[in-house]
């Protein structure tokens, strides 16, 4: 499966959704995608939120022709009900080579304070959580 199809899926899945700053949400996965190197990393980067935030499923992605390697990497960066806490989720991403790179890129973009309209206690807590997660992922 190719990058072009992954972009089409992401654009359609995130259509009409805005981020916390009011920008089209699709700009986030596209930014994550552009910060990665290989085609597989870029595919996972642009699709990293489709299962977590939209009607897409891992099965549907596999049916679209994405390889087990790609679907497993997307799974590694998708929060699930089995995650007892955020550290379980981060450790799962860390254990997948593609997932690790994608999650690092995702967190770095999420830490861009220019995307946040106002920084309060909630945002500071989130930024601290992201900083700790980066330490774990980069260790």
Where are these regions (language model features)?
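Active-site helical microenvironments for divalent-metal-assisted chemistry
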Residues: 1-139
């Amino acid at each position: 499966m190719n990058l072009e199809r992954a972009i089409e899926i992401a654009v359609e899945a995130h259509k009409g959704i805005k981020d916390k700053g009011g920008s089209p949400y699709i700009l986030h996965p596209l930014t994550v995608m552009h910060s990665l190197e290989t085609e597989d990393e870029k595919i996972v980067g642009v699709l990293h939120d489709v299962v977590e935030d939209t009607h897409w499923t891992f099965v549907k992605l596999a049916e679209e022709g994405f390889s087990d390697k790609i679907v497993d990497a997307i799974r590694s960066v998708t929060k699930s009900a089995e995650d007892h806490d955020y550290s379980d989720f981060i450790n799962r991403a860390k254990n997948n080579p593609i997932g690790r790179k994608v999650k690092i890129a995702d967190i770095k973009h999420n830490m861009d304070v220019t995307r946040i309209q106002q920084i309060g206690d909630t945002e500071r807590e989130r930024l601290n959580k992201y900083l700790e997660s980066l330490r774990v992922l980069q260790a």
